[in-house]
Every structure is written in C-alpha cells, then in structure tokens.
C-alpha cells in the first residue's frame, strides 16, 4: 500500500487525466487511486464479468489517450483470479500509460519477469509468499517510470549526503522514505534465501499440481 501510494501521489497528474483499474481490488490498490479524485483525476473502475474475471478486453474499453496509469493485481485477493498481465501491459503501453502491478498475492509463488510482462511498477508486501513479516515489502520501478514519478517523502537514504542541496540518487533508492526496519529485513532475508534455494519455478510447478 505504501509503494502504490507513493506512485499515486508522486505522478504529475493534470486535471482530466485518468487511471484505470479493476473494481473491487484490495484496498491497498484502490484507496491510493480513489484519493486522486480530489486532484481532478478520473478514476475508472472496470467491473468484473459474471465469472469475476477482469479481461484485457474489458480493461481496453476504459483506456484512452488521457490514461496515465493502468493498475491491477496479478492475482485478485478475493477470488484468486489471475490476470493476463502481458496483454494488459501491452494495452497500457499502446496508450503511453504506465503499467503497475500489485503482486502481493503471487510474488514468491509465481515467476514474475517484469520486463517480459511489460511491468513498469510492481509492489508487494513481504508477509505472504515472500516469507517476510508485516511491515516489510518492496517497490520495483523501472527507469522510464523513475523519470516521471517524483519522491513524496525523501528520507536520508534517498539522496547524496549534502545538507544544502537535494540531489536524488539515480535509482529506486530515491523513493526511500526513512530508516529501514532492520530487524524485519534481516528476518526477510532468511525467507528469501529459502525461496532461492527451493526456486520459484519449483514452487510454481508444485502449486499447479494442487490447483
């Protein structure tokens, strides 16, 4: 939620711009966008079909030249529906929009190749399949998106060590809001080491044998 909120508030919106996302997404991928209505942003909610699916075709009907971001969950929290990320990303990019993915329900369980899938921004908490603890998580943001989205809470690790001028680092660290929760990340490292030892592809294959 924090990562998505930073993106939503850091984008240079103009009145009349729009963001497209499926209706009834998790609150962490809904509230940050709904808050943009106060800035005159058109928040377009795509209704799921009768089978609770949100297809690329249904999303495409809401995307136009004023769409700046298309956001969706890789796997919906309330139904388990798995989105066709590659096709949705293609739709977003065809309209020069950024593609953001909420990956909390799949990161660590499903291979997520961001470049292959056309994902510009991806965020997830660590406490599900990533074997972390509540309060830890990640925000992936590619170079193109970094040129557009401004930091909203620059912390001590976001810029060069200068007391008189703010010179952001040229990678995703410029979005770091403050001091790390070191105990959480030390614990998370152990979980990530275990995931790497087993392999995400192995985990995914195992899941498919039970679903």
Residue ranges and their predicted role:
Residues 1-211:
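Pyridoxal 5′-phosphate
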């Amino acid at each position: 939620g924090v990562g998505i909120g930073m993106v939503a508030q850091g984008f240079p919106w103009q009145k009349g711009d729009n963001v497209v996302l499926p209706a009834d997404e998790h609150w962490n991928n809904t509230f940050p966008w709904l808050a943009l209505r106060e800035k005159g942003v058109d928040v377009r909610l795509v209704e799921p079909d009768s089978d609770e699916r949100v297809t690329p075709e249904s999303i495409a009907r809401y995307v136009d030249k004023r769409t700046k971001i298309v956001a969706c969950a890789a796997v919906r929290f309330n139904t388990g529906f798995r989105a066709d990320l590659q096709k949705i990303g293609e739709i977003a990019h065809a309209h020069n929009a950024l593609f953001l993915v909420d990956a909390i329900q799949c990161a660590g369980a499903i291979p997520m190749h961001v470049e292959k899938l056309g994902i510009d921004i991806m965020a997830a908490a660590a406490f599900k399949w990533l074997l972390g603890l509540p309060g830890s998580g990640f925000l992936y943001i590619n170079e193109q998106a970094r040129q557009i989205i401004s930091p909203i809470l620059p912390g001590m690790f976001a810029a060069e060590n200068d007391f008189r001028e703010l010179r952001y680092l040229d990678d995703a660290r410029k979005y770091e809001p403050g001091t790390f929760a070191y105990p959480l990340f030390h614990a998370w490292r152990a979980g990530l080491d275990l995931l790497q030892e087993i392999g995400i592809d192995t985990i995914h294959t195992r899941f498919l044998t039970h679903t």
